[in-house]
């Protein structure tokens, strides 16, 4: 029997479904909100810039090997020099972040018996993760020498973001064997290492490779903020005296490098880590294949150990600037009300409002594009001629640095803001990453049920609506929540190129210098960002509970708080009784 209330209907109370009329209403409201946000950000296009745009695009493909900015270098030499420099500090920063994230996620996961420690570590990480990335880009840039600063920025970013991935992964593991061994040994890490780690090491292996590839692409954004790396050569596109001809070779070097890592990831995932369909009768082949995997993984680990040692040796200077570091932390909790006014340009509520508009436009584009492309580009849902072109376009758009699209198209909005342009471009770029993740989710569904529906005569559209989408719905919503927070950070970070009003405020003050008044103003803007991002994290946490069909009251922390308050009441009651 179907039960219902005003909003939901259900047969099983743990599996409630929103009524169709409310779904339609939510979709209509979302559409209206998107249109209103888009209109609020819209700036007229300067079609007179079409000639300049065409000229820049043509120059991009001339691949000039000389730049008057670097007379002693050819651009091929300089591009590969900066590319190897970027790979070095990305490898070292990602490795350090990976190691830290592994241990902090383990200590703060369900494997940690001391729940107080779990909460303390998670609160610390959530606290720092809510700050805009640009704040710590500034901190490391003023406190450490160039290459060391770049390494620490990558470490910081990798640690905070990988911690969440690892924590979610660990908390969702089947712990049956672990619990049995833990009961015998009473050792957390040893039990984990012997019962679970051998089965999840491949997952961590791929986590590392994905993170390294992602960080190499991400460096072009922090390079726009002045951090050393290959992206500095892309910034020359903003210099009209140099032109776009000097950008072609650095861009090509970046694309070649990222394509190499794409193929490496594919090779590791499909060949090295995939051991299905081994013919056990052919013992010689079996030995070669199993040992090849083991040898390759050890070679990979040793190679990166060697690369990290080499990266440390090649860091040109380990110079620290203690006065700047001390000054930064001394004013970390500062907040200046006097920097604000009722003028829109200096009103923090207006900055946040613009950021909200950008996020609404972005997340709507991400939601639609990623879902459509993941379904149309899935190899199991479509034939080869359909999914290969879409997969190619998705990969091509994903490997081209975001900053190139912003520099190229911003010519149409000279003299006005580019908030809408940046929101759309970054949303399209993030859609390509989400397509990849959703494609993996689609490949993991129960395809026997899909085939049964096909035999029953259901159309392809019906099979997708009735089975495929419901099967990936939880993953889809969880991904969108994650990308919402990630998009806020990206928009603030791209303030260095005018990507957001709040980000521009942080960038301008950050580039002004290391004076105390600049740090005070920077911290004020950063705390505004912190409050906004922290609210998003709380909403993300709450909506994740809804997606997972959990109740707030089921959480351990809430239950224990209730227990503690009850105990305190009993203590006071007993004390009051004894006093009488």
Curated annotation (Swiss-Prot):
It is found in: Cell membrane. Its main location: membrane. GO terms for cellular component: plasma membrane. PROSITE patterns: ABC_TM1 (PS50928). Residues 83-265, 352-540 form the ABC transmembrane type-1 domain. It is a multi-pass membrane protein. Keywords: Cell membrane, Membrane, Repeat, Transmembrane, Transmembrane helix, Transport. The chain crosses the membrane at residues 22-42, 83-103, 120-140, 150-170, 214-234, 247-267, 295-315, 349-369, 403-423, 464-484, 490-510, 527-547. GO terms for biological process: transmembrane transport. Probably part of a high-affinity transport system. Belongs to the binding-protein-dependent transport system permease family. This is ABC transport system permease protein p69.
């Amino acid at each position: 029997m179907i039960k219902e209330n005003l909003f939901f209907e259900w047969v099983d109370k743990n599996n409630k479904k929103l009524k169709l009329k409310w779904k339609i209403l939510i979709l209509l409201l979302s559409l209206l909100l998107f249109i209103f946000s888009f209109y609020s950000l819209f700036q007229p296009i300067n079609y007179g810039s079409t000639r300049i745009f065409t000229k820049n695009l043509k120059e991009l493909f001339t691949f000039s090997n000389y730049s008057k900015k670097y007379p002693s270098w050819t651009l091929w030499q300089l591009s590969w020099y900066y590319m190897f420099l970027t790979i070095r500090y990305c490898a070292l920063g990602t490795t350090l972040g990976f190691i830290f994230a592994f241990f902090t996620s383990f200590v703060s996961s369900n494997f940690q018996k001391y729940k107080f420690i779990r909460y303390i570590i998670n609160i610390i990480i959530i606290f720092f993760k809510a700050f805009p990335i640009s704040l710590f880009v500034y901190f490391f840039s003023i406190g450490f020498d160039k290459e060391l600063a770049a390494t620490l920025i990558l470490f910081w970013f990798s640690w905070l973001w990988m911690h969440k991935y690892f924590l979610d992964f660990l908390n969702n593991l089947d712990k049956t064997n672990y619990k049995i061994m833990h009961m015998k040994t009473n050792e957390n890490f040893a039990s984990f290492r012997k019962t679970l780690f051998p089965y999840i090491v491949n997952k961590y292996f791929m986590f590392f490779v994905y993170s390294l590839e992602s960080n190499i692409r991400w460096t072009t954004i922090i390079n726009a903020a002045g951090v050393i790396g290959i992206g500095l050569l892309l910034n020359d596109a903003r210099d009209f005296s140099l032109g776009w001809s000097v950008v072609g070779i650095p861009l090509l070097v970046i694309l070649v490098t990222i394509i190499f890592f794409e193929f490496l990831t594919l090779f590791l995932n499909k060949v090295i880590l995939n051991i299905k369909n081994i013919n056990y009768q052919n013992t010689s082949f079996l030995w070669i294949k199993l040992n090849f995997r083991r040898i390759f993984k050890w070679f990979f680990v040793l190679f990166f150990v060697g690369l990290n040692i080499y990266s440390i040796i090649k860091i040109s200077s380990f110079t620290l600037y203690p006065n700047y570091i001390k000054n930064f932390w001394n004013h970390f909790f500062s907040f200046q009300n006097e920097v604000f006014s009722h003028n829109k340009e200096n009103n923090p509520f207006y900055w946040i409002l613009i950021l909200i508009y950008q996020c609404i436009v972005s997340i709507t584009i991400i939601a639609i594009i990623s879902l459509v492309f993941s379904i149309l580009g899935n190899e199991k849902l479509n034939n080869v001629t359909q999914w290969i072109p879409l997969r190619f376009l998705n990969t091509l758009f994903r490997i081209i640095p975001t900053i190139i699209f912003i520099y190229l198209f911003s010519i149409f909005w000279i003299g006005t803001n580019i908030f809408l342009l940046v929101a759309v471009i970054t949303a399209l770029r993030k859609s390509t990453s989400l397509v990849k993740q959703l494609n993996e989710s689609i490949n993991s569904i129960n395809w026997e049920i899909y085939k049964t529906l096909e035999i029953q005569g259901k159309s392809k559209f019906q099979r997708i609506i009735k089975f495929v989408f419901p099967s990936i719905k939880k993953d889809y919503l969880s991904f969108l929540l994650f990308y919402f927070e990630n998009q806020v950070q990206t928009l603030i970070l791209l303030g260095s190129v005018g990507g957001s009003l709040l980000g521009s405020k942080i960038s301008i003050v950050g580039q002004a210098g290391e004076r105390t008044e600049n740090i005070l103003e920077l911290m004020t803007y950063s705390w505004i960002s912190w409050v906004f991002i922290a609210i998003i994290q709380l909403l993300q946490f709450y909506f994740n509970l809804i997606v997972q069909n959990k109740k707030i009251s089921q959480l351990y922390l809430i239950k224990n708080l209730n227990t503690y308050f009850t105990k305190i009441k009993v203590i006071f009651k007993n004390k009051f009784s004894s006093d009488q």
